Structures are given as structure tokens and as C-alpha cells.
UniProtKB/Swiss-Prot annotation:
Protein name: Glycosyltransferase 6 domain-containing protein 1
Native species: Rattus norvegicus (Rat)
Lumenal topological segments: 27-311
Molecular-function GO terms, alphabetical: glycosyltransferase activity; hexosyltransferase activity
Record key words, sorted: Glycoprotein, Glycosyltransferase, Membrane, Signal-anchor, Transferase, Transmembrane, Transmembrane helix
GO biological process per UniProt: carbohydrate metabolic process; lipid glycosylation
Transmembrane segments annotated in the record for this chain: 6-26
Listed cofactors: Mn(2+)
The keyword Protease belongs to this UniProt entry's keyword annotation: no
Top-level EC class: transferase
PANTHER family reported in the protein's UniProt record: GLYCOSYLTRANSFERASE 6 DOMAIN-CONTAINING PROTEIN 1-RELATED, GLYCOSYLTRANSFERASE-RELATED
């Protein structure tokens, strides 16, 4: 564990250097963002929460003007990234519908790089040619220590963001493979740090949210605190912001291991966003669990989230 601690310290120092170099980029990016009032009107959806206490927009159908956003972002000449992990049996059963639907509905009209993380060689499904889309199939080494899928996912993701993704895209989303796009997932979702509201817990009282309540865990959030419960199926933002999350997640996991406790990926995610407020929240429309009845607040399901045995 001492060796792990030294490695973690060295990694942290290198990562902090990267973050310092990224500060100017992030500051400039935020200054160039289109003013919220130009494209976002929270008054059009009085039936739901549309603005957080820290004034971040919550994106629901009807609150945004995509035409205004399209006009702005097309001038920026931006590239989007979408990362998905498809290992073991997920390769064919879940990846095909994910990619087929994403190629149609994810950021249409923009350059998109799909980063597909697999544990063996993969033949992509046949899809219509789109000159704006490219695919990178990245093989994850099969190592025995990857007993924890999320630990593997964040370790590999962090490595690829540092080595090349941060140079290739302006915005990056990471999504679960057991999802199918049903409507446009467009530029209304872009921001420095993007969090996805949990489809089930959004409609529950905050006192019942399943945060980590053990003080010994790095994911701990005390009773009476917390904003929303965020889903682990989608996270996004500028590459350095996603990289920051992977770093904090890995740091928290190692700390918990050293203290003899463990928590879940989603609870670490919620602790991160509790301390580092997202600049944009996606409504449950962007990751709707198909096992739930659709409430009247959900006008259009953008992405359907399926249990892993339903596809």
C-alpha cells in the first residue's frame, strides 16, 4: 500500500501540472460561451426544476433554442468525443444498438470521434458512411487485477484522455453501453462540466437519496447535505474536466482501499459533483430507464437506458 501511495502522489503531482496548464483554456472557454439568456428560457417549464441553486441550467425539452445554439457552435468548428466501454459479452449484444443509434442522433452535423474501449479485437457494425464521424477502437489490456469494472474504466479513460483525447476533441461524453438513442442528443448538452440527473431519484425526496453515509469513506456526504442524485450512465464536459473526475475518483478509491472500506462508482460520482458543482445538468429525458413508467414531465426520451438483460 505504501508503494501505491507513492505512485498516487507522483501521479497527483503530474496531474496537477496538467490542470494548471489547462486553467487558461477553461477560462477562455467559459468566457466564449453563449450567454444563457440567448438560448435558455426556464419559464417555459414551470413543472420541473430548470435552474439549480448555483444557477446552472437543467436541460429539459422546451427550455432551449437549438437553432440559436447551432448557429453559434457551427462557427466554433468544434469536435465532439463519445466514449463507451464494451467488454466481454457487451461487445455485440449492447454495442451494436448503441453505435447504430448514436451515429444517427449524437451531435448530428458535427465532427464526432467515437472511442470504443474493448477487451479484444472488434469488427464494427455496418453503418451508413458519415464523413463527419470517425471511430477509434482501443483495446483494453486483459489484466487479472481488473476485478472492478469501474476502476478499470476510469483508469483506462484517464490514460487515453491524457495521451491523446484531450488533443482531439473539444467536448467529451462518457456513456454506458446499454443505452439506445431515440432523439437528438445535441449541442444543448454542451458545457464545461455536465452531469446527468438520475431518472429514478430525481422524483424522490432529497432526504432519501442513496449517498454514501459512512464517514470512513471518501464518498461520504453527511445527512442533510447534497443537491441531486446523479446517474453514472453519462458524464461529460471539456476533456480536462472529465480527466479531473477520473483523477478524483481513483484517488478516492485508493484511499478507501487503504482504510478498508469501499463504495460504488455512482456514490463517488455524487461526492465529486457535490464538491465540484456541474455547470449544466441533463434532465432524466437524457437517460430514461425503460423499466419505469414515463411521467408527464418527460416529454421526449432522448436516450433510453436498458437493464443489461433487456437488449
Amino acid at each position: 500500500m505504501k508503494a501505491k501511495g507513492r505512485i498516487l502522489l507522483l501521479t497527483s503531482c503530474l496531474f496537477l501540472l496538467l490542470l494548471l496548464l489547462a486553467k487558461i483554456h477553461l477560462r477562455n472557454h467559459q468566457e466564449e460561451e453563449l450567454p444563457l439568456s440567448d438560448w435558455f428560457d426556464p419559464r417555459r417549464r414551470l413543472d420541473v426544476i430548470t435552474t439549480t441553486d448555483w444557477l446552472a441550467p437543467v436541460i429539459w425539452e422546451g427550455t432551449f433554442d437549438r437553432k440559436v445554439l447551432e448557429k453559434y457552435y457551427h462557427k466554433q468548428n468544434i469536435t465532439m468525443g463519445l466514449t463507451v466501454f464494451a467488454v466481454s459479452s457487451f461487445n455485440g449484444q449492447y454495442l451494436d444498438p448503441f453505435l447504430q443509434s448514436a451515429s444517427k442522433f449524437f451531435m448530428p452535423g458535427y465532427r464526432v470521434i467515437f472511442y470504443i474501449m474493448v477487451d479484444k479485437s472488434l469488427k464494427l457494425p455496418e453503418m451508413g458512411h458519415n464523413p463527419l464521424q470517425s471511430f477509434q477502437v482501443l483495446v483494453v489490456s486483459q489484466e487479472r487485477q481488473w476485478s472492478d469494472f469501474d476502476l478499470m474504466r476510469m483508469t483506462v479513460l484517464s490514460k487515453h484522455i491524457r495521451e491523446h483525447i484531450r488533443f482531439e476533441v473539444d467536448f467529451l461524453f462518457v456513456m454506458s453501453v446499454n443505452m439506445v438513442f431515440q432523439n437528438v442528443f445535441g449541442v444543448e448538452t454542451l458545457s464545461t462540466s455536465v452531469a446527468q440527473l438520475h431518472a429514478w431519484w430525481y422524483f424522490r425526496k432529497t432526504t432519501h437519496l442513496p449517498y454514501e453515509r459512512r464517514p470512513t469513506s471518501a464518498a461520504y456526504i453527511p445527512f442533510g447535505l447534497g443537491d441531486f442524485y446523479y446517474a453514472g450512465a453519462i458524464i461529460g464536459g471539456v476533456p480536462f474536466q472529465v480527466l479531473d473526475f477520473t483523477h478524483q475518483y481513483l484517488k478516492s478509491v485508493i484511499l478507501d482501499i487503504e482504510n478498508g472500506v469501499n463504495s460504488t462508482y455512482e456514490k463517488y460520482l455524487n461526492k465529486y459533483f457535490f464538491l465540484n458543482k456541474p455547470t449544466k445538468l441533463l434532465s432524466p429525458e437524457y437517460s430514461w430507464d425503460q423499466t419505469f413508467n414515463i411521467p408527464q414531465q418527460v416529454h421526449y426520451v432522448k436516450v433510453a437506458h436498458y437493464p443489461t438483460d433487456d437488449l
